[in-house]
Protein backbone atom coordinates (compact mmCIF):
# COMPACT_ATOMS: atom_id res chain seq x y z
CA UNK A 1 0.00 0.00 0.00
CA UNK A 2 2.76 2.45 0.90
CA UNK A 3 4.58 1.76 -2.36
CA UNK A 4 1.42 2.19 -4.41
CA UNK A 5 0.70 5.48 -2.68
CA UNK A 6 4.26 6.80 -3.00
CA UNK A 7 4.00 6.12 -6.74
CA UNK A 8 0.70 8.05 -6.93
CA UNK A 9 -1.65 5.17 -7.68
CA UNK A 10 -5.33 5.31 -6.81
CA UNK A 11 -6.05 1.98 -5.13
CA UNK A 12 -9.24 -0.07 -5.22
CA UNK A 13 -9.87 -3.04 -2.95
CA UNK A 14 -12.71 -5.00 -1.40
CA UNK A 15 -12.62 -2.79 1.69
CA UNK A 16 -12.66 -5.59 4.24
CA UNK A 17 -10.17 -7.22 6.60
CA UNK A 18 -6.90 -9.04 6.02
CA UNK A 19 -4.87 -8.14 2.94
CA UNK A 20 -7.49 -5.56 1.94
CA UNK A 21 -7.06 -3.74 5.24
CA UNK A 22 -3.26 -3.95 5.11
CA UNK A 23 -3.23 -2.42 1.62
CA UNK A 24 -5.66 0.34 2.62
CA UNK A 25 -3.61 1.10 5.73
CA UNK A 26 -0.44 1.42 3.68
CA UNK A 27 -2.15 3.66 1.15
CA UNK A 28 -3.50 5.95 3.87
CA UNK A 29 -0.09 6.17 5.59
CA UNK A 30 0.93 9.29 3.67
CA UNK A 31 -2.47 10.56 2.63
CA UNK A 32 -3.22 8.36 -0.37
CA UNK A 33 -6.71 7.39 -1.47
CA UNK A 34 -8.19 3.91 -1.24
CA UNK A 35 -11.60 3.07 -2.70
CA UNK A 36 -13.44 0.17 -1.07
CA UNK A 37 -15.91 -1.77 -3.22
CA UNK A 38 -17.96 -3.31 -0.40
CA UNK A 39 -20.05 -6.50 -0.46
CA UNK A 40 -22.92 -5.16 1.62
CA UNK A 41 -25.47 -2.38 1.59
CA UNK A 42 -23.81 -0.37 4.37
CA UNK A 43 -20.33 0.79 5.25
CA UNK A 44 -20.36 -1.14 8.55
CA UNK A 45 -18.13 -3.87 7.09
CA UNK A 46 -15.39 -1.59 5.76
CA UNK A 47 -12.03 -1.22 7.43
CA UNK A 48 -11.06 2.09 9.00
CA UNK A 49 -8.59 3.00 6.24
CA UNK A 50 -11.06 3.21 3.35
CA UNK A 51 -11.41 6.77 2.04
CA UNK A 52 -14.17 6.25 -0.50
CA UNK A 53 -16.59 3.43 0.36
CA UNK A 54 -18.93 2.10 -2.31
CA UNK A 55 -21.59 -0.12 -0.74
CA UNK A 56 -22.85 -2.39 -3.52
CA UNK A 57 -25.13 -4.96 -1.82
CA UNK A 58 -23.77 -7.35 -4.47
CA UNK A 59 -21.93 -9.83 -2.26
CA UNK A 60 -19.04 -11.52 -3.98
CA UNK A 61 -20.27 -10.45 -7.41
CA UNK A 62 -18.85 -7.05 -6.55
CA UNK A 63 -15.52 -8.54 -7.69
CA UNK A 64 -16.64 -7.79 -11.24
CA UNK A 65 -16.87 -4.10 -10.32
CA UNK A 66 -13.34 -4.24 -8.96
CA UNK A 67 -12.08 -5.68 -12.23
CA UNK A 68 -13.93 -3.12 -14.34
CA UNK A 69 -12.71 -0.23 -12.15
CA UNK A 70 -8.99 -1.00 -12.30
CA UNK A 71 -6.45 -0.56 -15.06
CA UNK A 72 -4.46 -3.49 -13.64
CA UNK A 73 -4.94 -5.93 -10.80
CA UNK A 74 -2.49 -6.97 -8.10
CA UNK A 75 -3.44 -10.23 -6.39
CA UNK A 76 -1.76 -11.01 -3.08
CA UNK A 77 -2.21 -14.55 -1.75
CA UNK A 78 -5.94 -15.09 -1.32
CA UNK A 79 -8.66 -17.68 -1.59
CA UNK A 80 -11.63 -18.06 -3.92
CA UNK A 81 -12.57 -14.38 -3.78
CA UNK A 82 -9.13 -13.49 -5.06
CA UNK A 83 -9.44 -16.19 -7.71
CA UNK A 84 -12.70 -14.68 -8.95
CA UNK A 85 -11.11 -11.20 -9.06
CA UNK A 86 -8.25 -12.64 -11.11
CA UNK A 87 -10.68 -14.38 -13.47
CA UNK A 88 -12.74 -11.23 -14.04
CA UNK A 89 -9.63 -9.15 -14.70
CA UNK A 90 -8.21 -11.70 -17.13
CA UNK A 91 -11.54 -11.93 -18.97
CA UNK A 92 -11.39 -8.15 -19.39
CA UNK A 93 -7.84 -8.40 -20.76
CA UNK A 94 -6.42 -6.54 -17.77
CA UNK A 95 -2.90 -7.15 -16.53
CA UNK A 96 -2.86 -9.30 -13.40
CA UNK A 97 0.25 -9.28 -11.23
CA UNK A 98 0.48 -11.77 -8.40
CA UNK A 99 2.45 -12.16 -5.20
CA UNK A 100 2.15 -15.64 -3.66
CA UNK A 101 -1.23 -16.12 -5.30
CA UNK A 102 -2.92 -18.52 -7.72
CA UNK A 103 -0.54 -19.99 -10.29
CA UNK A 104 -2.70 -19.82 -13.42
CA UNK A 105 -2.13 -18.73 -17.01
CA UNK A 106 -2.22 -14.97 -17.37
CA UNK A 107 -1.04 -14.10 -13.87
CA UNK A 108 2.40 -12.49 -13.88
CA UNK A 109 3.85 -13.67 -10.58
CA UNK A 110 6.43 -11.46 -8.89
CA UNK A 111 8.49 -12.20 -5.79
CA UNK A 112 8.51 -8.71 -4.26
CA UNK A 113 6.42 -5.59 -3.91
CA UNK A 114 9.24 -3.55 -5.49
CA UNK A 115 9.01 -5.65 -8.67
CA UNK A 116 5.25 -5.11 -8.78
CA UNK A 117 5.75 -1.34 -8.64
CA UNK A 118 8.43 -1.49 -11.33
CA UNK A 119 6.03 -3.41 -13.59
CA UNK A 120 3.18 -0.97 -12.94
CA UNK A 121 5.43 2.02 -13.55
CA UNK A 122 6.60 0.57 -16.88
CA UNK A 123 2.96 0.13 -17.86
CA UNK A 124 1.52 3.45 -16.74
CA UNK A 125 4.25 6.08 -16.45
Task: For each feature predicted by the language model, list its residue ranges.
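A short, Lys/Arg-enriched amphipathic alpha-helix followed by its capping loop at the start of a domain
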Residues: 3-9
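A short beta-strand-loop structural module common to alpha/beta enzyme folds
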Residues: 10-17
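Short acidic-hydrophobic, aromatic-tinged amphipathic segments that line or gate anion-handling sites
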Residues: 53-57, 97, 107-122
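Structural loop-to-beta junction motif characteristic of Rossmann-like glycosyltransferase folds
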Residues: 74, 93-95
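Acidic/glycine-enriched connector segments
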Residues: 17-88, 100
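Short, flexible loop segments at boundaries between secondary-structure elements
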Residues: 103
